């Protein structure tokens, strides 16, 4: 009778240690199944520095002639499910996990195998890749959060900061133990770093991005990148010309659970998706933000988040209608209705002068998904159907406030030499931003 063995791992930069462990696992039986962790699952459990894509790691394992089957591991409960699904006789794992998987003895026999000393993916990454050096542009709340979260991503290092006020810059660098600080942007960009994170006033984004790209820096910038279509097109054209990465800081797009949600929806479980509804409200005034910030309005400040969810699921919009409420010359709320392919509808509600439950619903012909508030910090989502017994829930780890997943994506893309994220493509960024552009054009007309 065939004896089935299963094991799991990331297998980043496949090395002799991996090979030895896999061969030891195969020696325990006849049929070896290898589970390769998805990039999103790795990030959900704090593994933020994986250098190879999921596809590259799977391909490396598939080339091994002694491996009989390769599967993708996407969530923490999958191991127990796989033991039953594949009729596994032995679950094999490295002895650095001794005791961690004893609970699986309920389903199969667990075998802890000796690992090869002196070799690891971490060591290989340190040898092959240099740490991404980054400069921060802006000293506001976002900058402080970014600096804290970047400490959890091992392949990036903040080494410089720019601000308009030199006294504030010097105070910030001293408190944060950052080597370089400057109040002259052009001089700042001459410093030896690879990339910038921009969190300045919205009206300064375009100029700060353009100047950074011209200085051959990769750019991660708070949203929106620009309020005009021509400006945005110009920035992406410049990034392409300079062969530099330009990415908008929509952190939801890089959260493990958010990406798993999109993959689940692509399987067609809900049937044809007819409507996506999402809300995002934030009372900036009550939180003590300056008027110069929140007077940009709810649409410019918040709409890109609901638009992200709608665009990722329904694609590019065909028509857009705005229903805003304005006070003191800016919109305190806006209900935005978009139409899409096959008559699907997107409903986005944003507000800075009203409070609303920040949840999201994705409605299909066979069922719906409910994402509880705050949906943009996606941790949990529920699939629900007419038959309530068929309902199920996904729960993912979500560490910090989500910035570390975005930072990990940004730094990994730079190290790989990739100029576009598959989690948030250039076309998607332009489609999302286009809704804001249309609103501002309508206000001016």
How does the language model describe each region?
Residues 1-131:
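Nucleotidyltransferase catalytic core that binds NTPs
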Residues 18, 143-146, 205:
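N-terminal Rossmann-fold NAD(P) dinucleotide-binding loop
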Residues 252-321:
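Predominantly a Rossmann-like dinucleotide-binding segment in NAD(P)-dependent oxidoreductases
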Residues 234-251, 272-276:
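Rossmann-fold dehydrogenase core element
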Residues 176-236:
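Beta-loop-alpha module in the N-terminal Rossmann-like domain of NAD(P)-dependent dehydrogenases
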Residues 130-176, 445:
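N-terminal Rossmann-like dinucleotide-binding module
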Residues 187, 195-198, 341, 409-445:
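C-terminal helix-rich "cap/oligomerization" subdomain common to oxidoreductases
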Residues 301-302, 307-378, 408-416:
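Contiguous beta-strand/loop segments that form the cofactor/metal-binding neighborhood of enzyme cores
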